[in-house]
A protein has these predicted regions:
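Extracytoplasmic ligand/sensor domains, especially the bilobed periplasmic-binding protein
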Residues: 102-205, 254-281
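Extracytoplasmic "Venus flytrap"
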Residues: 37-56, 80-87, 109-110, 176-184, ...
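N-terminal secretory signal peptides and thylakoid transit peptides that target proteins
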Residues: 1-16
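C-terminal segment of N-terminal export signals and the immediately downstream linker at the start
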Residues: 1, 23-42
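Stable alpha-helical elements in mature extracytoplasmic
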Residues: 49, 53-60, 89-93, 113-117, ...
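Segments of small-molecule ligand-sensing domains
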Residues: 305-321, 327-387
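Beta-alpha junction/loop-to-helix N-cap segments that form part of ligand/metal-binding clefts
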Residues: 48-55, 68-143, 149, 207-214, ...
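Extracellular/periplasmic periplasmic-binding protein-like sensory domains
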Residues: 243-324, 381-385, 389-395
Length: 396
């Protein structure tokens, strides 16, 4: 049976405090399940990525268990819906470590939550893989247990800025983010980086993702002379309202920015399909097809593998493949002999690279940003095909 679409949009998160919890556990009985905690926003306004990741998580666990598990151990996914709330994420993390006795944790799925729980997991020594992009979430001295499976926001920001300045060849930039911890941090960094590279940031603001009327912000951006609008938000609802407002204003300006601008959720939120034109979202080589309509061979292999089992049409391919890769990275560590939390972390530090479907990840004891920068590209947001996208104009 296919994992079906759940119609949610993205949006809020805030930073919350953390509490001290227990120490890591080590040797496990051979027949004991391999318990992987999964911190996910599966409902609420920030749920679209979590839903996509969840499909990959479930498919990975089902596939591994159908093949006999890992060294005879069944994969058990311990899922907690955080609803994008850092406080709920903190409580779930403590439960997973202290009560559920998980062996590793995948997630959470947004940076506001991760800011709250990363120190907790570090104190407990729990192996953690996450897709959260705020640069400071990876620090091998403070958080030697934390590994990033997705690019950092710095890598995303570099791709967006390069596309705006070198391909679109614009100089007057408007930058808009939501009011989450992620949105505020991303806008601040983006403004500084554009200015550093000689661009004129004519307008910037953080707005509530639930704000219904985007006309005031769009009007200010146009009045300031913006030639492109850069968006940093995971809220597909907010993004769709911005696209619809652009059309209502008869303003032919480009959008560039966050990968969620290409989410299948947006299609149903648009007043007209053409409102999605001239929107360029961060993408990845592994999730992009060329003018011939073909994906890279390994990516096509995954599409074929999940056909009829996992829906890709209303989500992003990278969300599904990253979820799949994360579970397999835990399983691979155990398969290779890791018998403790410390062993799993030590094994991940030797991956040079790990051949996943989303990317080929390279980690060392000194570097836990594993995604290759060269594989971060821009995509035409409205060109989705099985959650993959046409490379944006200007790429060879």
């Amino acid at each position: 049976m296919s994992l079906t679409r759940r119609n949610f949009v993205l949006g809020t998160s805030a930073i919350a405090g953390a509490a001290i919890i227990g120490a890591p556990r080590y040797a496990h009985a051979a027949a004991e399940s391999l318990r992987i905690g999964w911190l996910a926003a599966l409902t609420g306004p920030s749920s679209a990525p979590g839903i996509g990741f969840d499909r990959g998580v479930k498919f990975a666990a089902d596939t591994l268990n159908a093949a006999g598990g890992v060294k005879g151990r069944k994969i058990e996914i311990v899922t907690r819906d955080t609803q994008g709330d850092p406080t709920k994420a903190v409580n779930a993390t403590q439960e997973m470590i202290n009560s559920q006795k998980v062996h590793a944790i995948w997630g959470p799925t947004n940076s506001g939550e991760s800011l709250a729980v990363t120190p907790i997991m570090a104190r407990a020594g729990i192996p953690n893989i996450h897709p959260c992009v705020i640069d400071t979430l990876i620090d091998t001295k403070k958080f030697p247990n934390a590994f990033r499976i997705a690019p950092s926001n710095g890598q995303w920001d570099d791709a967006v800025r390069s596309y705006c300045l070198k391909v679109l060849k614009v100089k007057k930039i408007a930058i808009i983010g939501d009011t989450t911890g992620y949105g505020v941090t991303a806008v601040k960094a983006c403004v500084a980086n554009f200015k550093r590279d000689g661009a004129d940031v004519v307008y910037s603001n953080n707005i509530d993702a639930t704000q219904t009327d985007m006309t005031p912000d769009m009007t200010r951006a146009r009045s300031a002379g913006a030639e492109v609008i850069v968006i940093w938000s995971v809220s597909t609802g907010m993004e769709a309202r911005l696209f619809n407002t652009r059309a209502e204003m008869n303003w032919d300006v480009n959008f560039a920015g966050h990968p969620s601008m290409a989410s299948g959720e947006i299609r149903g939120l648009l007043a007209k399909p053409q409102n999605w034109d001239k929107v360029y979202a961060v993408g990845y080589r592994s999730c992009s097809y060329g003018a011939d309509g073909k994906l890279p061979p390994k990516s096509q292999e995954f599409v074929d593998k999940v056909q009829g089992k996992v829906s890709l049409d209303d989500t992003l391919f990278w969300w599904v493949t990253a979820g799949y890769d994360a579970i397999n990275m835990v399983a691979k560590a155990v398969q290779e002999g890791a018998g403790s939390s410390k062993d799993i972390i030590a094994y991940w530090n030797t991956l040079h690279p790990y051949p996943g479907y989303f990317g080929n990840y390279t980690y060392t004891a000194e570097e836990h940003n594993g995604y290759p920068t060269a594989d971060v590209v821009m995509s035409a947001a409205n060109s989705a095909k099985h959650g993959t996208f046409l490379l944006a104009p200007g790429y060879v």
